[in-house]
Amino acid sequence: MGRIVKVLSLVLVSLVLVFGTGIAAEAKKKKKKVELTAEETAMFDKWEVKPKERAKAVKDMREKPKFVGAVKCNGSCHDAYYQAWTKSPHGGTYNLLKPGERKEAKLRVKLDPEKDYTTTPLCLRCHTTGYSQKGGFKPAGSKSKKGKDTATKIDPTEPNKEQVGCEMCHSVAGGSQMRAVMKSSKGNFTKAETEHYGQRWDYANVCTRCHTHKNTPFKPEVHDKYKFNFEERKLKVHKIADYWNEDNADQKLEKKDERAEQVGQTEKTPLLIEDFEINDKGKLKFTKGTKPYNSKKKTYNYKK
């Protein structure tokens, strides 16, 4: 009898290991349902988003914005733009921080041309994507509180957060929310809708974040080439026409011209530009009251 009980016990244990107790499955069934607001429902209706896809999309749109990297913008969405960007000055900004790069320019502003600046906070702020912000670039040597390596992995064949990517110019605090909007709407969105989820359209303003910042050593008084003209510089950023092909032709932005006629709130009233400094511990800190987005209140801060 004892032997039979023992065998039955072993069988029962085996069944539990294979199929589980059913508790996890039951918990999964009771997963909290996502309730959409009237505004969200109307927006998804307009975009004709399938009911089963709405919960995931709205979850991403409600979360705090974070940087996701230029590679996320590539693939089935913006391949031509990504390819053009990799060949642009912004697609190689991190490389300029390496020893031996741009020797003449560095000597001109009294920087050591043989020094490695790829972990220097003041440089990383403007030479990478989202440094010192949620989801942003983390240099070599970065560790979590538990000592885990958190440095951003760099693939030389696929530029990403280590360069000045899409989000540095097109988003307020990272493109995670906006990416959900683009995927759900399939490009059928207005400027106002995108601004609600972190897109910015004040490009001439946002460029001053780095190109004319008080801490940049590359000032006009050093050399005329450092005079910043937005209209001239933007022509070097996206030479898209050279990168359309049969594989990405279906990604052309059908609503681009239509949106160009719209005027976003950020175009009427530009957002604040973050000021920053390096503290006594050598870390980059944003000056209080200068951020364009308040993540706690979920509000945007405009220039007065």
State the predicted function of each range.
Residues 15, 80, 92, 214-217:
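Short secondary-structure junctions and interdomain/linker hinges
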Residues 175-178, 215-222:
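Substrate-binding/catalytic groove segments of enzymes
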Residues 1-26:
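N-terminal export/membrane-targeting signals
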Residues 19, 65-67, 222:
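Short, exposed beta-strand "edge-strand" segments with a Pro/Gly-rich flavor and a Y/T-containing core
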Residues 27-162, 167, 171-200, 228-304:
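Sequence context of c-type cytochrome heme-c attachment sites
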Residues 4, 222-225:
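Composition- and surface-driven signal marking solvent-exposed, interaction-prone regions
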Residues 188-219:
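Repeat-solenoid scaffold signature
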